[in-house]
Amino acid sequence: MDGHAAPPDPPAWVEVTSSPVSLTGTPDDALERALLARCGAGEAGLSAPARDVVSRKLRGLPMPEAGSIAFVQRAAGEPHPWARAWAASGKSLSAEATLRALDTWLSDDPTPALRRCGVASGAAYGTHAIAVVAVDAFADLAPLPTRGRTGQWLTIEAKLRVHADGGTVTILGPGGSTRRVPAWFDGTTLRTRFVLDRPGAFAVQVVASTSEGPRPVIEASVFADVEPPAHPAGDGEAPDDRRAPAAGSDDAALATTLASALASARSTAGEPELVRDTRLDAVARAHAERMAARRELAHDAGDGDPDERLRAAGLTARASGENVAHAATVALAHSALWASPSHRANMLRRDFDRVGLAVVRDDRGEVWAVETFASRLQ
């Protein structure tokens, strides 16, 4: 990319979502090659979101939100959740300084052996930019069509790259409802089938039961009898106010913002409002602080899984669930949870009647959010 930094064309959706898909050849740019070698294995579907980041940097725009990155990923057929992006720009880019900055960014990654990356670079108006988009590939997906027809049955086959005790598959359908489909798991591979029961967009999510608790490992989009969109629909926005909190907002105020967003989502879906429980707030708060301190998004950040943490607090529940998120703002954290089939299912689950909420802002100004759900809490 050189010359004028024009907005990129809308992404052209590939025919299937799958992984791994290796890069064809090596980057021509020496700095791109060095960054890719430092980051990890190249994944073809991550090149597109990296190019999008470069385009934004050259046009003086902020880094894309997580939902925008995921949209470009899915259009490119790349199925791994929780992608993160890094970029550098300037009149000239020192290889040594750029690699050092990348190393600092990568140092937050607790699972470097699972990391896959895409790299892109460009120049416009005398400014150079380079970007890396990385994911942790906890699983790989056999080819899944991105387009289908109503009534068609599709097979999901995900091969795990980490130890897991099992897994689930959740489908978010065109009407906004979620459903969990039965899946067969042989210790390494999870398989299931589902039907495109109506026209529209379907979001598929595979969640593995890892040593750190449930974790989304595969996400894909399928469109039945409709064309895929050219742009993300509100960045996965739920029915809430996306305004960022004012500078200096304390954690309690941020948790109240999250509570309002959750209440709005449930009200719009016709579900009763949850009762905020201070005991669950304390459990959520302790876990949010733990994740922020370790910079690790997980259901078990060394403090036990959600059920263990409830028991440690002297609490029992007929059913419980937990959502965790890490984002720049509370609104973006809520939007990311809303766009995730399994997390939305927790948010709208009818038999949950109580919730604990916590948001912790770290020293970088980023937020770590926890929603702890329960029914018949004692």
What is each model feature region?
Residues 1-5:
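Sec-dependent N-terminal signal peptides
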